[in-house]
Swiss-Prot record:
Mitochondrial 3-hydroxy-3-methylglutaryl-CoA lyase that catalyzes a cation-dependent cleavage of (S)-3-hydroxy-3-methylglutaryl-CoA into acetyl-CoA and acetoacetate, a key step in ketogenesis. Terminal step in leucine catabolism. Ketone bodies (beta-hydroxybutyrate, acetoacetate and acetone) are essential as an alternative source of energy to glucose, as lipid precursors and as regulators of metabolism. This is Hydroxymethylglutaryl-CoA lyase, mitochondrial. The active site is at residue 266. Keywords: Acetylation, Disulfide bond, Lipid metabolism, Lyase, Metal-binding, Mitochondrion, Peroxisome, Transit peptide. Substrate binds at residue 41.
Length: 325
């Protein structure tokens, strides 16, 4: 009994320390998070069955109604490469433009930029990578050559007063190269920032990252680029998306990409889950007292709508749980 009595205070001290650590971690969280909804573009682009234009438009309008302030609407790529995005101009022209909401579109080159602007785009996104092999297999050039292509886009965007967002894929791992050096991610991110991208989204393309790897990567990147110019884009292939996102928030990132209903698979891991579900992200942020401006019920309705249209189950744990209640 005496031994147990002596052991108890030590255990209590341990619990108190744990509580203190987690409280101090929570103190570093942002009061507000901007969610960039990528479902209509990143989520739908790999769907085998073509989604009708009216369905895409209704989905985006429902997401706007839910209070999301940034909704990536479509991609101005060649229909030859991404047939799902062939109706990009019709979608961008057909959606309701809500005040205070931006509707960026992804573009691969200057031709895509010009088509996007002609369709009324006010913001565009460009896509790079921290992996040489991934870049070579995706766009058939080196990282340096890809930036030469981006240069023309950024100059044209500046002249047209169009905001440009950059994506860096494979920041926590590559399907071809494996581990990626944090220094390489920092180098590529710094290049995007110095060229004029107002925000750079750091993507864990194959979802292999863990909070420790996320911390190391962000520590390197934040030595070159201010946290206010960074976003994270986590995939849930290994179930780490929310944990990695929380680590990024604790380190000062306040912009997070996510996809309604978790739309968007990982093309490098058959059957694996893809994007972080927006519903799950909002639920976590609300639980932490972080403002998002998003109405979770309306968001769930948007997720339910698109899942019915696709004849598939949602990947959102929150949506799955609430439909059972």
């Amino acid at each position: 009994m005496a031994a147990m009595t002596k052991a108890l205070p030590r255990r209590l001290v341990g619990l108190a320390s744990l509580r203190a650590v987690s409280t101090s971690s929570m103190d570093t969280l942002p009061k507000q998070v901007k969610i960039v909804e990528v479902g209509p573009r990143d989520g739908l682009q790999n769907e085998k069955n073509i989604v009708s234009t009216p369905v895409k438009i209704k989905l985006i309008d429902m997401l706007s109604e839910a209070g999301l302030s940034v909704i990536e609407a479509t991609s101005f790529v060649s229909p030859k490469w991404v047939p799902q995005m062939a109706d990009h101009a019709e979608v961008l022209k057909g959606i309701q433009k809500f005040p205070g909401i931006t509707y960026p579109v992804l573009i691969p080159n200057l031709k895509g930029f010009e088509a996007a602007v002609a369709a009324g785009a006010k913001e565009v996104s460009i896509f790079g990578a921290a992996s040489e092999l991934f870049t070579k297999k995706n766009v058939n050039c080196s990282i340096e050559e890809s930036f030469q292509r981006f240069d023309a886009i950024l100059k044209a965007a500046q002249s047209a007063n169009i905001s440009v967002r950059g994506y860096v894929s494979c920041v926590l791992g590559c399907p071809y190269e494996g581990k990626i050096s944090p220094a390489k991610v920092a180098e590529v991110t710094k290049k995007f920032y110095s060229m004029g991208c107002y925000e750079i989204s750091l993507g864990d393309t194959i979802g292999v990252g863990t909070p420790g790897i996320m911390k190391d990567m962000l520590s390197a990147v934040m030595q070159e680029v201010p946290p206010a110019a960074l976003a994270v884009h986590c995939h849930d292939t290994y179930g780490q998306a929310l944990a990695n996102t929380l680590m990024a928030l604790q380190m000062g990132v306040s912009v997070v990409d996510s996809s309604v209903a978790g739309l968007g698979g990982c093309p490098y891991a058959q059957g694996a889950s893809g994007n972080l579900a927006t519903e799950d992200l909002v639920y976590m942020l609300e639980g932490l007292g972080i403002h998002t401006g998003v109405n979770l019920q309306k968001l769930l309705e948007a997720g339910n709508f698109i899942c019915q249209a696709l004849n598939r189950k949602t990947s959102s744990k929150v949506a799955q749980a609430t439909c059972k209640l």
